[in-house]
A protein has these predicted regions:
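Exposed, low-structure sequence patches enriched in small/polar residues
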Residues: 1-267
C-alpha cells in the first residue's frame, strides 16, 4: 500500500509512508551505483538470504588470524496479476485496482537480483583485506522508468579494500573497484584513499570514472574531524546525476560540483 501527498504523483515523489527495499544495503560506491527501490504500487515478491563461514586460525584458509567468507543473495520478482473484466484500460489502473493475485503468484518480470561473495581476512597485525565479487541484475525500466541500452542492466563488480595501521594513531585505507556492464552507461572504475590520524582527523580523496559513455571523472576530496559526539566535514567534489539511496529512501539527485559543509551531533 502506498500513500502519497498527491494521488497523481508518480515515480519516487510524494510518498508519505516508506517501505525499505528487501535487499542488501551496499556501502561501496560501485555496488551501490544502481540501488533498488521497493515497487510499492506494482507489488513484488522479495527473497534474501545470507550464509557466513569462519575459517579457523592455523588452517590453510584461516591463516594466523582467521578468515570470514560471506555469501549474500537477493531475488525480487513481479506479482502475477489476473485482471478483472470491467475495469477498463490496464495501463490506466493504479495501485491494486482491477486485478487479483494468488499468494504465491509470480509475474513475468524480474526486478532485481544481487549475488555477492565477500572475503574478510586479517593478514598481519597491521594489514587487513576485504575482497568482493558481485553479480547484479537491475531492471532500470521498472525502477527508474526508462532503460539505457536495454531495460535490464547486468553488472559484474569487483571490489578490493586494503587497510594498513602502522601505529595506534595512524591508519590508512585504499579501495579499488571495477564495474562491467554492456547496458546503461557501461564500465566504471573507482578509487579511494583515506588517511586517519589520532582517531579523530580523517582526510580522503576519491575518483569515479566512466570508461565508456561519458568518460567523465567524478572526483571528491575532503577532511573530517570528530570530537566526542560532534562531527564536522568539509569536502569538494563532483557528483553524477542519478538515484541516491540513503537509509532506504531513494531520490533523484541532479549533477553538481562544489563545496559541501556538514555538521552532525549525536544526542
Amino acid at each position: 500500500m502506498a500513500y502519497r501527498s498527491d494521488r497523481d504523483r508518480e515515480g519516487s515523489a510524494g510518498f508519505i509512508n516508506h517501505m525499505p527495499a528487501f535487499s542488501m544495503t551496499h556501502t561501496y560506491a560501485l555496488p551501490a551505483l544502481y540501488p533498488y527501490a521497493t515497487q510499492i504500487a506494482d507489488g513484488e515478491w522479495a527473497f534474501q538470504g545470507e550464509f557466513a563461514y569462519n575459517f579457523k586460525r592455523k588452517t590453510p584458509m584461516g591463516g594466523r588470524y582467521g578468515t570470514t567468507l560471506k555469501l549474500n543473495a537477493t531475488y525480487i520478482h513481479s506479482l502475477q496479476k489476473d485482471y478483472i473484466d470491467g475495469f477498463g484500460d490496464k495501463e490506466a489502473l493504479k495501485g491494486t485496482e482491477g486485478y487479483k493475485s494468488p499468494f504465491f503468484g509470480f509475474g513475468d518480470e524480474t526486478y532485481y537480483t544481487d549475488v555477492n561473495l565477500t572475503l574478510d581476512k586479517k593478514i598481519t597485525k597491521k594489514w587487513s583485506l576485504t575482497a568482493m565479487y558481485m553479480y547484479q541484475l537491475y531492471n532500470q525500466k521498472v525502477v527508474e522508468g526508462h532503460g539505457i541500452n536495454g531495460d535490464i542492466v547486468h553488472s559484474h563488480i569487483l571490489v578490493g579494500d586494503v587497510k594498513y595501521a602502522p601505529t595506534r594513531n595512524v591508519s590508512m585505507r585504499a579501495e579499488l573497484q571495477y564495474l562491467y556492464t554492456k547496458q546503461a552507461e557501461g564500465q566504471w572504475v573507482y578509487g579511494l584513499y583515506e588517511l586517519s590520524l589520532f582517531r579523530s582527523l580523517m582526510l580522503y580523496v576519491s575518483d569515479m570514472y566512466n570508461i565508456d559513455a561519458t568518460k567523465t571523472h567524478y572526483y571528491s576530496g575532503g577532511v573530517s574531524y570528530n570530537w566526542r559526539s560532534h562531527r564536522l566535514q568539509v569536502a569538494y567534489g563532483r557528483t553524477r546525476a542519478g538515484y541516491n539511496c540513503s537509509g532506504g529512501v531513494c531520490r533523484y539527485v541532479p549533477a553538481s560540483r562544489g563545496v559541501t559543509l556538514s555538521y552532525n551531533v549525536i544526542f
